[in-house]
Amino acid sequence: VTRRTAEGRPVRRAALTLAAATVLLAGCAGTTQAEPDRKPSTVPVTPTAPAPSGRTADGTLLVADFGADTVTFVDPDKGPVDSVKVGTAPYGLAVGEDGRAWVATAEGVAVVDTEARRRLALIPYETENLGEPTHGEYRGGGMGIALAPDGKHVYVGVNVPDANGTVETIDTAAREVTDVTPVGRRPFDVDVSRDGDEVYATDHDSFDVTVVDARSHDTRRIEVAPYGTEGGLGSWLKPHYAAVRPSDGKLLFPFEGEKLVVVDPDTGRSTIERMTANTHQHGVTITPDGTLLAVGTGPIDPAEDEGPSLTVRAPDGKEKVIPLDGPHEDVAVSADGRTAYVTGGFTRDGYWNGITVVDLGSGDTRRLPAGERPLGIAVL
């Protein structure tokens, strides 16, 4: 398939933005209307009965079951082996070197012992006006979440329906919230600088990233809007997830498989590099050598855009685009860097209950059952 680039078609403007929000699914649009019942994709995966609980092997996957109240442990060869109840609609998760997972749910941040496979605590949010814990893309509560490099603090982005969100700082030893910092609307993703001095909240509905000083909790807003902000809450062309580049600490935001926005968090300046997948993009991760992986969820406009894919972008900018079957949301990479695991949960319609396992060398893919609408993922 010939993939069109940003240079090969007109720049999208408000007409496309508003038309997409009206005609297509409203998953990325900032609305607080009640969602219709979500229906998963009908593409089948072969279920595997959970195995008895036991020692969690290295390389086991942990996924957040956004359509349930659990996290699921997944053998990357066989499928689910166990699950642990954590709280309503878990979204993102982060795992420390001590094996404890911190899971952002609608109710609070759950702490899970991944070795014993049990929940140790549920830390309630201090942010107000979250509403009753519920399911759906626009629910109140935790979204993106990240650990400080030294493991002493967790930072969770908290969505406040119809308002700006917050980043809550949690002391991991005390297991309590120590600070609540205002940020933009719907903090999809949270990342931390290499030295732990700054926290970055990707504010989906504000077209920006909020830079939070980890000590003083002072904030700076940096706009991330390569297509402009026309359309406001109805726009699809917003930032979703970011990656911190290991070589220089700059933030990488993929947009539409056309543009990679590279933000210098120190100066607030950004540059744009060309991408080639030509598809709406959500989850990202980056490997220690600087290889960026970006999840393409599928087209905004089927007449213009390509289908779901995984972009593997080398540090020199060369890209391999691997087609995927159906929408996906987030991605993690095996310790040896050879395999990617892409969650099928998705924040919009078309989600499915599994992950796609991608051989990054050959580009071969296979589907694996995994939880209920899995979003966040980590390799244990």
Q: Where would I find each of the regions flagged by the language model?
A:
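Secretory targeting and sorting signals
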Residues: 1-34, 42
